[in-house]
Amino acid sequence: MKIYIIDNGGQWTHREWRTVRDLGVDSTIVPNTVDADVLADADGIILSGGPASIESEISKLGNIKEYMHRYNYPVLGICVGAQFIAIDSGGRVSKALHAEYGKKIVNFTSKDGIFYNIPDSINAWENHNDEIKSISDDYIICAYSDTCRVQAFYHKNRDIFGVQFHPEVNNTEHGTTIFKNFIEKCRR
């Protein structure tokens, strides 16, 4: 099994790689500009977080649109990766009313997809200035916080998932469980 971590310039991309590796899966970090042919053997991809502001810097996200649409593997978007999925679906992302950095309580309304075996509420690590305001009806919004309406979502028919928070950071409770559940989707 092989999972590629698409590097969007996030400070914790190596944590995502290490978490997947520590769960026993071959993983490789690649820049978001790599040719999509490199991902032909992928069983899944993770779109890392990054410093890009979607509104003004979407070009810094390289080829991730092609990576999502060329192959039919599971996709997990983290932070700016999730924001890209929302925009790609026809949703909207813009500046958050309050930039977030630190722990936040995230409440789950549904635990389907990769969000099973997680409590109804977790402490999660946040680090974002932009946030998802809306997403296409093809997706289910399954988690929120008191300041961010879209903390997690999943596609109704495909294995595409997104989280605004950072499950790879130790301060996020049950973050490893989210990665384990994603890996299980990649095994199918």
From Swiss-Prot:
Which pathway features in its UniProt record?
Purine metabolism; GMP biosynthesis; GMP from XMP (L-Gln route): step 1/1
E.C. numbers: 6.3.5.2
Q: Which UniProt keywords are present, listed alphabetically?
A: ATP-binding, Glutamine amidotransferase, GMP biosynthesis, Ligase, Nucleotide-binding, Purine biosynthesis
Q: Which PROSITE patterns match?
A: GATASE_TYPE_1 (PS51273)
Select a single GO molecular function from the record's annotations and give it: GMP synthase activity
Coiled coil region boundaries? none
The UniProt record lists the keyword Nucleotide-binding: yes
Q: Name one GO cellular component term.
A: cytosol
Annotated Glutamine amidotransferase type-1 domain ranges read: 2-188
Keyword Nucleotide-binding listed:
yes
Catalytic activity, per the record?
Answer: XMP + L-glutamine + ATP + H2O = GMP + L-glutamate + AMP + diphosphate + 2 H(+)
* Active site residues of this protein: C79, H166, E168
Its assembly, as annotated, is: Heterodimer composed of a glutamine amidotransferase subunit (A) and a GMP-binding subunit (B).
* PANTHER family reported for this sequence: GMP SYNTHASE [GLUTAMINE-HYDROLYZING], GMP SYNTHASE-RELATED
Instruction: Describe its function.
Output: Catalyzes the synthesis of GMP from XMP.
Query: What name does this protein carry?
Result: GMP synthase [glutamine-hydrolyzing] subunit A
Q: Which organism is it from?
A: Picrophilus torridus (strain ATCC 700027 / DSM 9790 / JCM 10055 / NBRC 100828 / KAW 2/3)
